[in-house]
């Protein structure tokens, strides 16, 4: 079994103090997970590995400070056991966790307790998700976390920015529109590697998103295809936003707060020469959500999950049920939320529409696809698009500084 101790020496320079102890939210005892059953063996190993990792981390004291070596560390577990029940886990697999102490620290700064993280990911198999950036996505069964499949190159990119990302999160006290990165893993089943990164869900675990935009601030080749538009929840783009005459109706104070966060985060991305990111905008129509909820049976998590694959049933109604365990678990202990209401400690990317808006809406806004650095591929793409569209066209592949300027200008104009 892998050791979870720090690999840094006592003489290494200090990087950042761990956060001070905060008042913990009400917490519930959670049943130990014994079966890690999913339709995909990779997901079964992922659930097993997260459960094992958190159990091990709980035996290790939280370090007073993070050391430089913590940003390079990893733990690896290799299992060769033919006695495993193959219905639950493959007989040979590897589970590797990157920078466990760093992500543990980030989870704390984002207000996520390890036991809740463990329950959200390991109690029941993640479900196939959709719509928060590129790549294969899964959503935790309680819909609070996104598990995204990434490439080995993106793992390297994440390592390259992790120290600066951590410092940025410390400086802004966790108040950011950037993805909240919570863990990064490699799963090996039958000699095939799968890389996964876990993030907080930018959309609500409870309120259904009715319209969705991916905005880059460019109008060239930025319109949803006909194939995309017929989907149940299409991802619309910049041209669609303009053609639909869409606006975000928030108060002036909310707009200022949003733009302050956005400017701070974009400056951070420019410093790291990162570009091609988007603003993900999800819109919940409160009246429509209320109607859908009335038309449907009362949504809740029952024990009618598919016994073969352990997947929780996907509820397509105005608002989702809440899970008894995990990050959203304590919601059940407080007063029920009304239409369009949310807990800002869970739905951290959410903001209500302003009084007097044409209709009551809830907006979810965050930055996605933030691992693209300006390199030779981007330079080549920029040259090709310049030839095709002309030097003055608003193409998406430009230099990081130009990209940021255009992006901020566009986003500042999405508000009513």
Swiss-Prot record:
InterPro entries xref list: PInositol-4-P-4/5-kinase_C_sf (IPR027483), PInositol-4-P-4/5-kinase_core (IPR002498), PInositol-4-P-5-kinase_N (IPR027484), PInositol-4/5-P-5/4-kinase (IPR023610)
Gene Ontology cellular component list: endoplasmic reticulum; plasma membrane
Domain of life: Eukaryota
Keyword vocabulary terms for this entry: ATP-binding, Cytoplasm, Endoplasmic reticulum, Kinase, Lipid metabolism, Nucleotide-binding, Transferase
Compartment(s): Endoplasmic reticulum; Cytoplasm
Enzyme class: transferase
Principal place of residence: endoplasmic reticulum
Post-translational modification: Phosphorylated, phosphorylation is induced by EGF.
Known EC number: 2.7.1.149
PROSITE patterns given in the database record: PIPK
Biological function: Phosphatidylinositol 5-phosphate 4-kinase with low enzymatic activity. May be a GTP sensor, has higher GTP-dependent kinase activity than ATP-dependent kinase activity.
The protein's name in its UniProt record: Phosphatidylinositol 5-phosphate 4-kinase type-2 gamma
Organism for this UniProt entry: Danio rerio (Zebrafish)
High-level lineage: Eukaryota, Metazoa, Chordata, Craniata, Vertebrata
């Amino acid at each position: 079994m892998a050791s979870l101790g720090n690999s840094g020496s006592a003489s290494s320079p200090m990087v950042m103090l761990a956060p001070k102890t905060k008042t913990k939210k009400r917490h519930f005892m959670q049943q130990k997970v014994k079966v890690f059953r999913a339709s995909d063996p990779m997901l079964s190993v992922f659930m097993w590995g997260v459960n094992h990792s958190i159990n091990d981390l709980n035996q290790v004291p939280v370090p007073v400070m993070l050391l430089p070596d913590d940003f390079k560390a990893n733990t690896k577990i290799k299992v060769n056991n033919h006695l495993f029940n193959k219905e639950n886990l493959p007989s040979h697999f590897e589970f590797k966790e990157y920078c466990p102490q760093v992500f543990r620290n980030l989870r704390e700064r984002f207000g996520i307790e390890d036991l809740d993280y463990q329950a959200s990911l390991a109690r029941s198999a993640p479900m196939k998700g959709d719509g928060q950036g590129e790549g294969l996505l899964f959503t935790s069964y309680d819909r609070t976390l996104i598990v995204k499949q990434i490439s080995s190159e993106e793992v390297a990119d994440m390592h390259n920015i992790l120290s600066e990302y951590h410092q940025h999160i410390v400086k802004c006290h966790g108040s950011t529109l950037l993805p909240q990165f919570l863990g990064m893993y490699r799963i090996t089943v039958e000699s095939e590697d799968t890389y996964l990164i876990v993030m907080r869900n930018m959309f609500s675990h409870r309120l259904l998103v009715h319209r969705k935009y991916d905005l880059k601030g460019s109008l060239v080749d930025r319109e949803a295809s006909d194939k995309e538009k017929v989907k149940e929840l299409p991802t619309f783009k910049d041209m669609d936003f303009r053609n639909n005459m869409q606006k975000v109706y928030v108060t002036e104070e909310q707009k200022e707060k949003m733009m302050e966060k956005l400017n701070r985060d974009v400056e951070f991305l420019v410093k790291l020469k990162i570009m091609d990111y988007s603003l993900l905008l999800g819109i919940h129509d409160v009246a429509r959500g209320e109607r859908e909820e009335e038309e449907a049976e009362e949504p809740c998590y029952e024990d009618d999950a598919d016994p073969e694959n352990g997947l929780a049933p996907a509820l397509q109604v105005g608002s989702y049920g809440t899970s008894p365990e995990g990050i959203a678990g304590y919601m059940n202990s407080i007063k029920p939320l009304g239409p369009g209401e949310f807990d800002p400690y869970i739905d951290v990317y959410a903001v209500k529409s302003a009084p007097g808006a044409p209709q009551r809406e809830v907006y979810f806004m965050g930055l996605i696809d933030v691992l693209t650095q300006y390199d030779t591929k981007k330079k080549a793409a920029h040259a090709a698009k310049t030839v095709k569209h002309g030097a003055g066209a608003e193409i998406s592949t430009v230099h990081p500084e130009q990209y940021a300027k255009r992006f901020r200008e566009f986003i500042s104009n999405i508000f009513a």
